């Protein structure tokens, strides 16, 4: 029976709280996936809340026609947008989800979504930990991950703070946002233009009765 351990530590104001918490279940798994840097640009056309055009900062941006991307800006992210016909530094897009696009002239980061194969049944999940890890401890970029069933229908989506693990201790009382059909894959991206990231996932789940 696999076991995961996580720790909670809070200190200050003359007090200290520290606890190691072990969790066990019938099964579990791990994923570590490299996420390349995003590319800088400017929103130069805002047609509606999820349609527009970005002018990339350089011609070697690598964003291609038909790519599936997440778009980041200060205070928001729109995920699962589809890129139209790319011409030079001009990148049109449509169909994103999440936050409404900002105003014209806003600096943005365009990041191609990376596929992560999973075998995760949220209904039997007991603990899930996730972290967007950067070697640069000063990195502050927000990143994003979306979980899907085989439909593909969205099961859950999360914003990820740089180098800040999130732990869903479901057996310990945390809300389970991953319930529904089994999760077969996720798409994640990197909101930083300077530092590559490693997405880390650890989870435990009990066997279905």
Where are these regions (language model features)?
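C-terminal interaction-tip segments
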Residues: 1-18, 189-209
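N-terminal low-complexity, intrinsically disordered "leader/linker" segments enriched in small/polar
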Residues: 1-42, 113-125
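Small/polar beta-strand repeat architecture
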Residues: 37-113
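Short, well-ordered loop/turn sites that connect or cap secondary structure elements
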Residues: 62-65, 125, 160
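A short beta-strand element within beta-rich, extracytoplasmic domains
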Residues: 69-71, 123-134
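Extended, low-complexity, turn-rich repeat/linker tracts enriched in Gly/Pro/Ser/Thr and Asp/Glu
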Residues: 76-78, 133-143, 191-195
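Short, surface-exposed beta-strand/strand-loop-strand elements in extracellular ectodomains
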Residues: 131-158
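Noncatalytic modules at the cell exterior or secretory-pathway interfaces
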Residues: 172-198
């Amino acid at each position: 029976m696999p076991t995961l351990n996580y720790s909670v530590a809070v200190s200050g104001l003359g007090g200290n709280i520290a606890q190691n918490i072990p969790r066990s279940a019938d099964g579990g798994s791990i994923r570590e996936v490299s996420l390349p840097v995003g590319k800088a640009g400017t929103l130069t056309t805002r047609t509606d809340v999820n349609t527009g055009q970005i002018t990339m900062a350089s011609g070697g941006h690598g964003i291609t026609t038909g790519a599936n991307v997440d778009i980041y800006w200060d205070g928001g992210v729109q995920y699962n947008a589809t890129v139209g016909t790319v011409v030079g530094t001009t990148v049109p897009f449509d169909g994103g989800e999440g936050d409404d696009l900002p105003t014209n002239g806003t600096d943005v980061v365009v990041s191609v979504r990376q596929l992560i194969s999973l075998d995760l049944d949220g209904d039997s999940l007991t603990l899930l930990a996730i972290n967007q890890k950067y070697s640069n401890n000063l990195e502050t970029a927000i990143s994003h991950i979306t979980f899907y069933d085989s439909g593909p229908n969205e099961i859950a989506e999360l914003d990820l703070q740089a180098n800040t693990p999130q732990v869903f201790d479901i057996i310990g009382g945390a809300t389970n946002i991953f319930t529904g059909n089994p999760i077969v894959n996720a798409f994640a991206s990197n909101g930083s233009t300077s530092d590559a990231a490693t997405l880390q996932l650890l989870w435990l789940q009990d066997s279905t009765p």
